[in-house]
Amino acid sequence: MSGSGAMLLGLLILVAMATSLDTREICWNHSECDDPSEWCCRMGSGHGSCQPVCRP
């Protein structure tokens, strides 16, 4: 019983980690942006949007 419970808990943690990774802002230096002053891109919804600053 405890074995399957631990496996379920592990699966829940894995899903939570995957979703938190998906909505996180991923930053790099303006290689993907039209404006060289913009360098922060949000990758959550599959396409990044360039922004001048990166919010935590």
UniProtKB/Swiss-Prot annotation:
Keywords: Disulfide bond, Knottin, Neurotoxin, Secreted, Signal, Toxin. GO terms for molecular function: toxin activity. Disulfide bonds join C27-C41, C33-C50, C40-C54. Residues 1-23 form the signal peptide. It comes from the Eukaryota. Expressed by the venom duct. The keyword Cell membrane does not apply. It is found in: Secreted. GO terms for cellular component: extracellular region. Its main location: secreted. The cysteine framework is VI/VII (C-C-CC-C-C). Probable neurotoxin. This is Conotoxin Cal6.41b.
